[in-house]
Amino acid sequence: MFVTRLMQEKEFTSGVKPLRLMERSVFSDRMVFVRAVHEAKWMNEMEISIYDCWFDDVVSALPGVVPDGFIYLRAIPDTCHKRMMLRKRAEEGGVSLKYLQDLHEKHESWLLPIDSGNHGVLFVSKPSLQMDNSLHPDIKDRVFYLEMNHMHSSIQKVPALFLDCEPNIDFSRDIEAKRQYTRKVAEFFEFV
């Protein structure tokens, strides 16, 4: 995944700053998926150290891989698993609930770490009053800044939009919910 992100960055590099919406970033690759591979013992300590050095060098050399903002579509693993089962995509057939639980825990501990006292709570760091006033009222209570010790230095203070995507929302049938979420994402893009 990391190499794919870098190739995308190289492809998009031009004089104009593009608007890109990506499913994952190099940071979610590092903080979620590489951690999962390491914990599964598919990557040893030496390999993780090499990866970290390489990661830091590449992020420093290619500032375009640092996003202007993150959007966290938050749902519990059971909800994600049920939605996957309903989609019936062949490539998702082998994804277990346990795997989704592991990824969810890694996303939560990355974005909402336990030592901050905010694990499982939608709060990291509120925007400053000046920034807060520039936020659209529909997303004002959903935008936070990533600023924890475990965050990579290049994403400290990057805004994140947290959206709850729980089972009571059926985006395939509820057109109004889809419009509301689309508006929130558009308002966040306008903000960043």
Segments from the language model and where they lie:
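Generic surface-pattern signal
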Residues: F2, S14, D56, S60, ...
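ATP-dependent NMP and nucleoside kinases share a basic, alpha-helical "lid"
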Residues: E9-S109
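NTP-dependent small-molecule kinase module
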Residues: M85-V192
